[in-house]
Structure formats: structure tokens, C-alpha cells
Amino acid sequence: MTSVMSHEFQLATAETWPNPWPMYRALRDHDPVHHVVPPQRPEYDYYVLSRHADVWSAARDHQTFSSAQGLTVNYGELEMIGLHDTPPMVMQDPPVHTEFRKLVSRGFTPRQVETVEPTVRKFVVERLEKLRANGGGDIVTELFKPLPSMVVAHYLGVPEEDWTQFDGWTQAIVAANAVDGATTGALDAVGSMMAYFTGLIERRRTEPADDAISHLVAAGVGADGDTAGTLSILAFTFTMVTGGNDTVTGMLGGSMPLLHRRPDQRRLLLDDPEGIPDAVEELLRLTSPVQGLARTTTRDVTIGDTTIPAGRRVLLLYGSANRDERQYGPDAAELDVTRCPRNILTFSHGAHHCLGAAAARMQCRVALTELLARCPDFEVAESRIVWSGGSYVRRPLSVPFRVTS
């Protein structure tokens, strides 16, 4: 008897993250503009877009699909996490978003990526050698989690001894966006984070360095009692800490079972390491760590046969769009390291395309290159992978990893 997957959408949990793909495919095939009406709170209804063409179009149309009310399906999100008066850059629309992004981008140049790459490689090699000497271990704890924290800290100019604070802040804020979110912990985390970075901003006024905060301070943001400017820098640090860590962890951690299951694909990369940059694009497509983010409609908009009213949340399901057979062919769900996929939505698209995409790609390329060179015959205990909670970012908390040669 063949089972039929329901095309009802459910926000993900740690229990469902291992395999959301059948639900996504059912949505794409049967209800690509899906309307979710919570039985207990029908006024909190929202829509889910699952096909690549629809998600791509919505992501680039910031005038219709606004980020200014928040990025989850929770109405009142900014109030929930204490950022109503100081929304971060990712929760702003052009032209406000555009002007600040221009200033911030000075700290995200190709030179910055090149500068940090040797440090990334050294860190990756040290951690992999430790894992290899021990015959394996939890590769997320040892490598994939601390790696992006180190890079985010580099971009923000945070001293090494303070890096570990990032994880606690991120976990508390992500928890607040669960259905029954722990908002008190999130508010405490935001308060602690803002206090820390307020001190760092003041320090950079007298001790400038080559980092994003220093560039903003040097541009005069927050100078001479400009409280709004200082708050905008703080909101930017919020975006970096909460958004810059989990995506790289999700991609690298999510890639381990994919490569474990497909030794033929791993062998292609071992035989031709020059193909690793293209493989990174394919792994970014399939893992899609940020599985979806929401927008709010500014007007009535019709997609297919469905009209979405103004003022409704719309979840752009990047993880589904990246596996859409209409875009990537009938084998879209399969790993093909030679695919060279175009127009992936892993870093979104349009005005809100991820500012740190180049740095994320570099980390993934370096980590994958060194992993395959030093541990070519690794194994992963898939049944023991533990996934993080939260409904928007798919990342493992633990991936048991064994070196077999």
C-alpha cells in the first residue's frame, strides 16, 4: 500500500527537521500557495509559498512582500523580542535598508574574506586533526559550531575571549520564535547582547580596527549624541550574531549525512578537488539552512488562483524552493556535486540577499576541502544526529562522526 503525504503545512520542530521534504513536495505539487489557519487563533492565519518561481518573485518584490514587520509567522514579532523601536537591517525595507546596507558593506569586502581565510583554514585543520587523533567525535561541537562564531566575531571585531557568549544569545532568541516561545529568555539575551556591543562601539571610537563596527563608527554613525545611529549599529550586531552563526553550522552539519549516503559523490570530489566550489553550491541548495522566512503583504496580491490579502504573513519556503523539480529537474532531491545549480535561494534574493554569503561560502569550501583531504573515509551515525529546535533554521546540534582510516 502506498502512503500519501498530506499537504498540510506544519512549522518544523527538532523531531520533524530530519525529513521535511515529503511535506514540501506535497505542497509544491498540490497547494503551492497554502493557507494556514490556526484553529485556536484564526486571526493569526498566514500563507506558505513552496515553489521556486513564486518564492524567487516574492523575495525580490520588497514593495509587496515587506520585511519591516518581522521574519517569522508570528504577528507582533518585533515586540516579542524587544526590537520594535530598533529593528535590525534584515527587518527593514528600502530605502532605509539600502542606505545602511551600503555603510555596512564596507566591512564585507572580498579583501575581508581573503584576510580571514588563513585563520579559518588553520582553525579547521586543528579541529580536524584533533578529531582524527581521537578516531572521531561530535563534529558539530568540535568544528561546525565554533567556526562561524569565530568568523562573525572577526567581522565585528570581538575579542576571542568573548566568542562563547554568542551561542547563548542565539539559542535564547531562536527559542522565542517557537510556537510557544520563551520570550523572557529572548529579552534577557537581547539586553545582554546590546549592553556588550554598546561597550564595544564606544571602544571602537578610540581604538578603531578593520571590522564592520569600526567602519560604521568611522562613517559617523552614532556620533555626537546620535542615539538612533548607535541603535542602528546595535541592531546590525543582532543580525550578525543571530543570523551569521547557524547558517554555516546548518550547511556543514547537514552536508555530513548527504556525503555519508553517497560515497560515489564523495569519490568524485576526492578524485577532483577542483570541483569542491561547485559542490558547495549543491550542498547549499540541498541543506538550505534557513528553510524559510516570512514577509508581510503591503497590498492584496494574487499568486496562481489564490489572492493573499494585505497585511498577512507569507512564509517564503526557501528549503522547498531549492528542491523544486520545476527548477532543478526530476532528480532535484538528489545530491549531484556536478550540478552547478543556478538561482539557489539559500541566501535569499533581492534587496535582502545575505551580506555574508561570500564569507559563508568560503568557510564551507575550506571546511569541505580539508575534511575530504584529512578524513576521506569518514562515517556518520545518522540515527544519532540531534537537530535543533526552532522552526526556521535547520541545523544539527550534534553529528556523531567517525574516522575509519
UniProtKB/Swiss-Prot annotation:
CDD domains membership? CYP130-like (cd11078)
For whether the record's keyword set contains Metal-binding, the answer is yes
Q: Which cofactor does it need?
A: heme
Gene Ontology biological process terms, A to Z: cholesterol catabolic process
Q: Does the keyword DNA-binding apply?
A: no
Q: Which GO terms describe its molecular function?
A: cholest-4-en-3-one 26-monooxygenase activity; heme binding; iron ion binding; steroid hydroxylase activity
Recorded hits in InterPro entries, A to Z, give: Cyt_P450 (IPR001128), Cyt_P450_B (IPR002397), Cyt_P450_CS (IPR017972), Cyt_P450_sf (IPR036396)
Going by the UniProt record, its keywords in alphabetical order are: Heme, Iron, Metal-binding, Monooxygenase, Oxidoreductase
Q: What class of enzyme is it?
A: oxidoreductase
Activity regulation, per record: Inhibited by azole drugs.
PANTHER family the record matches:
BIOTIN BIOSYNTHESIS CYTOCHROME P450, P450, PUTATIVE (EUROFUNG)-RELATED
This protein is called Cytochrome P450 130
Q: Origin organism of this chain?
A: Mycobacterium tuberculosis (strain ATCC 25618 / H37Rv)
- Gene name, Swiss-Prot/TrEMBL: cyp130
